[in-house]
Amino acid sequence: MNWWIEEYKKYHREQNDYGNGGALKFHKRHIDDLIFDTKAETLLDFGCGKGDVYEVNDWHWPTPTLYDPAIPEHDELPNGSFHGVLSTDVMEHIPEDQIPEIIDQIFSRAERFVYLGIANNEAQAVLSDGTNAHVT
């Protein structure tokens, strides 16, 4: 297991409000357009966190398959492809040496579109060793 996945498992356990998908709302209209324009019927949320955002909001989207290696309920990366793969507030948490593998995992599952929402600032979250959670 990668050290960073273990760090995020721990962080999710300790911080109840962390990983609730709040960043997704800032990207919604762009994702709405992609879903509409590509007529996407199947979605994968890669790095979904706890996935709570889908329980609270009515997105008018096909219900996405949820994947997040730090969340036991969603930690199995699905095989196969999806019309669209979205990943918001994820890539900046991936160590640089792991990025090619993660990009491959995302793009190899996308048939019609990929949407990456990537923060370019420091995170509020700090890992147990004092490292800022936005490691890339």
Predicted regions and their residues:
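A short His-aromatic
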Residues: H93-I94
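Conserved residues at the C-terminal ends of beta-strands
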Residues: T88, D97, G117
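Short glycine-centered segments of the SAM/dcSAM-binding site in methyltransferase folds
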Residues: R112-Y115
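Conserved N-terminal segment of class I S-adenosyl-L-methionine
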Residues: M1-G84, P100-D104, R109, N120, ...
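A short beta-strand submotif of the Rossmann-like class I SAM-dependent methyltransferase core
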Residues: G84-V90
